[in-house]
From Swiss-Prot:
PANTHER family: ENDOTOXIN_N DOMAIN-CONTAINING PROTEIN-RELATED, PESTICIDAL CRYSTAL PROTEIN N-TERMINAL DOMAIN-CONTAINING PROTEIN. It comes from Paenibacillus popilliae (Bacillus popilliae). GO terms for molecular function: signaling receptor binding; toxin activity. Belongs to the delta endotoxin family. Keywords: Sporulation, Toxin, Virulence. InterPro entries: Galactose-bd-like_sf, Pest_crys, Pest_crys_dom-III, Pest_crys_dom_I, Pest_crys_N_sf, Pest_cryst_cen_dom_Cry2A/18, Pest_cryst_cen_dom_sf. This is Parasporal crystal protein Cry18Ba. GO terms for biological process: sporulation resulting in formation of a cellular spore; symbiont-mediated killing of host cell.
Length: 675
C-alpha cells in the first residue's frame, strides 16, 4: 500500500510505514473534492523547466501564457494583462534596441483602441480589496482613461507620420507633440491618486506611471532619429529621474500604509501573504523596474517573491503586525541555495462518531525543506525526532480515542533541482462530509515538477497554483497556535531557527521567484549565476551569495520595489562572495546599489582587486527614492571585468554603521546609464 496520502484504508492503531518516498499520482476510494479551485488539473504551464533563460520571447507568447494562466486560475483577482505588461517590459530591457516601448505598452493596455483592459485591472482590484468606486468617481476615472488613450493614439500617430515623412514635419512640431503628451501625463495621473481611493486605484496608477516613464525613455533613446535638440534631451533625462522617484515614492508609501492599515494590530499570515502577492503582481513589480529603466541592455534576473499558502482553518490564529518582518525573513531562509525537496511527518487519524459515523483528521506534525549539497532548512512544527514521534503516536493511539491511523509521512526529492524545479503546488483542506466525514478534514500539501508529483495527499491535488516565469524556490510553513511564544528577534541570514508547536504545522507555504539563470551549484549547495552569452547585462540578488565571513552580522531587509529584498550588514567589516559563470567574451562594468554610510568597498575578481569605492553616503547622495527606509544610489567600479566559468566576485566592506546591499548590476562596458 502507498501511504503518501492516496490510500485511505486504515490499519488498526499501527502505522503501516514510517517513511514513504511519494512521487506517484494515485486515485483512491474516497472521491477528492476541491474546495479551492485554482488551476485545472490538466493545465501545464510553459515555464516548467529552467532551460535557456536568455532566449528571446515575443509579446504574443506572454499574452498566451498569462491568458491561459488566468483561464485556469479563476479564484485569483489579478487581470492577466498585468503579467503581460511586466513580462514585456523585462523582455524589452534585455534588448539593445527597443526604440518605441511606449507604442508597445499602448497597444497592450488599450487594445483595439479600447479602455476595457485598464477597466479590467480596476474591477479585479475592486474584487480583491472588497471596495468599489462610487458611480461619480467611476465615471470620472473612465473619462480619464478615455482621454489618456486618445492622446496616446494621437502621439503615436504623429511619430509614425514623422518617421514616414520626416521632411514634412519640423523638429519644432515634434517638440510640440512631446510637450503636449508630457502635459497630458502630468495632468492625468493625479486622477489615479484620489485621496479616498488610493489603494483601489494604485494598480491603475502603476500602469499609467509606466506609460509616462516609457514615453520619456523613448524620447531619450530616439533623440538622434527624432531630431531632438540637446536642451530638450537633457530636460527629458532630468524628467526620467524626477518622475521615477516621484512615482516610486507614491506607490511604495501607499502600499506600506495600506499594509499597516489592513493588518494592524493583528491579522492572519495568510491575509498578509495574499496581499503582498497581489500587490507585487499589480504594482511592486513595475516599481522595481522603474529605477532600472536608465539601463538599456539589462536582464533582470530576480524578482520579489510571490506566495501560495494553504487554506487550513484549524487553529489558524492571528499574529501581531510586528511579527511580519521576522516572518518575511524566515520564509526566505536558505534563499541562496537551490531547493531540492521537502519532507514531512504526517498521520491520518480515524475516529468514530456515534451519530455521524467515521471521520478522518490529518495532522502534519512537522516539515523540513532540503537543498542541494545536503543542506536542510529548519524543522517547522513538532521538534521531536521521528523515533520520539512514533512513540508519542502509539501512546495516543492506545488511549482509545482513535479507531485507527495511517502514516502519511513523505520525503520528496527532485531529480534535477537546477533545471527541473517545482513550479506548482496544491494546498487545501477538504472538509466535505463525503470526503472526510462529518467533523473531519483531509490535507493536500503537494508539489509538482515536470516529472514528479509529491507530498501529502497527492490523490486530492486536483488544483495547482503556478505563475508564468516563476519557480518554487523555497518551502516554509506556519504552525498551529498553542500558546508558545515564538522568538521573533531578527534572524541572521541563513539561520536555522526552528519554529515550534506541539500541535504541528498549520499552513504550508510555497515561495516563487523568477530566478532562472542558475548555471549550477557550488560544493556547499549555493547557486552559481549564469551570465548571458549575447552581451546583455544582468543583475544578481544580494541574497544569492555563495559565502560570507560574518553570517551573524547579516540580515534580510525588506524592500518593496527592489526586485527582491536587500542584505543588511551590521558589522564593521565583512566579505561576501558571489559565484558567476560566463563565456569570457563580454566585458562588464560592476555597479552596486547600496543604501547607508560605507567607509570603503573593495571588489575582487579571481582574487585580484578591480578597484574600490570610498566614503559612500546615500543619506545625502541618493536617487530620491525611499524604500522601507532605504535611500539608495548606484555606484560603478571603473575597471572592467570578464566572466569565465566559475568566476568568484568578492566584495569587501568597511563601515561604522548598518547599511544595505540592494543589488549587483553587471552592465556591458559600452553602455552608459541615462542618468
Amino acid at each position: 500500500m502507498n501511504n503518501n496520502g492516496n490510500a485511505l484504508s486504515r490499519t488498526a492503531l499501527t502505522p503501516t510505514n514510517n517513511k514513504v518516498i511519494s512521487g506517484d499520482l494515485v486515485t483512491n476510494g474516497l472521491p477528492p473534492i476541491d474546495n479551492n479551485i485554482i488551476c485545472s488539473n490538466g493545465f501545464m504551464p510553459i515555464n516548467v523547466t529552467r532551460k535557456n533563460p536568455f532566449r528571446k520571447r515575443t509579446t504574443q507568447e506572454f499574452i498566451r501564457e498569462w491568458t491561459e494562466w488566468k483561464e485556469n486560475s479563476p479564484s485569483l483577482f489579478t487581470a492577466p494583462i498585468v503579467g503581460v505588461v511586466t513580462s514585456t517590459l523585462l523582455e524589452a530591457l534585455k534588448k539593445q534596441v527597443q526604440s518605441r516601448l511606449l507604442l508597445l505598452m499602448t497597444n497592450l493596455l488599450f487594445p483595439n483602441n479600447s479602455t476595457s483592459t485598464m477597466e479590467e485591472i480596476l474591477r479585479a482590484t475592486e474584487q480583491y480589496v472588497q471596495e468599489q468606486l462610487d458611480t461619480v468617481t467611476w465615471n470620472r476615472v473612465s473619462q480619464e482613461l478615455e482621454g489618456l488613450k486618445n492622446n496616446l493614439r494621437t502621439f503615436n500617430d504623429q511619430i509614425d507620420d514623422f518617421l514616414q515623412n520626416r521632411v514634412e514635419i519640423s523638429p519644432t512640431a515634434m517638440i510640440d507633440s512631446i510637450n503636449t503628451m508630457q502635459q497630458v501625463f502630468v495632468n492625468r495621473l493625479p486622477q489615479f491618486q484620489l485621496s479616498d481611493y488610493q489603494l483601489l486605484l494604485l494598480p491603475l496608477f502603476a500602469q499609467g506611471a509606466t506609460l509616462h516613464l516609457t514615453f520619456i525613455r523613448d524620447i531619450i533613446i530616439n533623440a538622434g532619429e527624432w531630431n531632438i535638440p540637446e536642451a530638450q534631451l537633457n530636460t527629458c533625462k532630468r524628467y526620467l529621474k524626477q518622475y521615477v522617484a516621484q512615482y516610486s515614492n507614491y506607490a511604495l508609501s501607499t502600499y506600506e500604509g495600506a499594509f499597516r492599515a489592513r493588518f494592524y494590530p493583528r491579522a492572519t499570515l495568510e491575509n498578509m501573504l495574499q496581499f503582498k502577492t497581489f500587490m507585487t503582481l499589480n504594482v511592486l513589480d513595475l516599481v522595481s523596474i522603474w529605477s532600472l529603466l536608465k539601463y538599456m541592455n539589462l536582464y533582470i534576473s530576480t524578482s520579489a517573491n510571490l506566495y501560495n499558502i494553504g487554506d487550513n482553518k484549524v487553529n489558524e490564529g492571528e499574529y501581531s503586525i510586528s511579527y511580519w518582518p521576522f516572518f518575511n525573513s524566515y520564509i526566505q531562509t536558505k534563499s541562496n541555495y537551490v531547493l531540492s525537496g521537502v519532507s514531512g511527518y504526517a498521520i491520518r487519524w480515524y475516529y468514530l462518531n456515534t451519530f455521524f459515523g467515521e471521520y478522518i483528521q490529518d495532522n502534519l506534525y512537522n516539515i523540513i525543506a532540503s537543498y542541494v549539497g545536503g543542506v536542510n532548512g529548519p524543522k517547522i512544527g513538532v521538534q521531536l525526532s521521528t523515533t520520539e514521534l512514533d512513540k508519542q503516536i502509539k501512546q495516543q493511539a492506545r488511549a482509545g480515542m482513535p479507531t485507527g491511523l495511517d502514516d502519511l509521512s513523505f520525503n520528496c526529492t527532485l531529480r534535477n533541482p537546477t533545471t527541473v524545479p517545482y513550479f506548482a503546488c496544491n494546498f487545501q483542506e477538504l472538509t466535505s462530509s463525503g470526503t472526510a466525514g462529518t467533523g473531519g478534514f483531509i490535507r493536500s500539501d503537494v508539489f509538482r515538477s515536470e516529472d514528479n508529483i509529491c507530498g501529502l495527499g497527492t490523490g486530492y491535488a486536483s488544483a495547482w497554483t503556478s505563475y508564468p516565469d516563476y519557480y518554487i524556490t523555497n518551502i516554509s510553513a506556519t504552525v498551529q497556535v498553542d500558546g508558545i511564544n515564538i522568538d521573533i528577534t531578527p534572524l541572521c541570514f541563513g539561520e536555522d531557527r526552528a519554529i515550534t508547536s506541539t500541535h504541528g504545522v498549520n499552513k504550508v507555504i510555497a515561495v516563487y521567484n523568477r530566478k532562472a539563470n542558475i548555471a549550477g551549484t557550488n560544493q556547499n549547495g549555493t547557486m552559481i549565476h549564469q551570465a548571458p552569452n549575447d552581451g546583455t547585462g544582468f543583475t544578481v540578488s544580494p541574497l544569492h551569495l555563495a559565502s560570507f565571513t560574518h553570517p551573524s552580522e547579516a540580515h534580510i531587509q525588506e524592500n518593496y520595489g527592489n526586485s527582491g529584498d536587500s542584505l543588511r550588514l551590521t558589522g564593521p567589516t565583512t566579505a561576501i562572495t558571489y559565484m558567476l559563470s560566463g563565456d569570457g567574451r563580454t566585458i562588464y562594468k560592476l555597479v552596486l546599489r547600496v543604501s547607508g554610510v560605507i567607509t570603503r568597498i573593495t571588489a575582487k575578481v579571481r582574487g585580484n582587486s578591480i578597484g574600490y569605492l570610498e566614503y559612500i553616503n546615500t543619506v545625502d547622495n541618493n536617487q530620491g527614492i525611499t524604500d522601507n527606509g532605504s535611500k539608495f544610489q548606484d555606484f560603478e567600479f571603473r575597471p572592467t571585468i570578464t566572466i569565465d566559468a566559475q568566476t568568484p566576485i568578492v566584495l569587501e566592506f568597511s563601515a561604522t554603521s548598518n547599511f544595505d546591499l540592494m543589488n549587483l548590476i553587471f552592465i556591458p562596458y559600452y553602455d552608459t546609464p541615462i542618468y
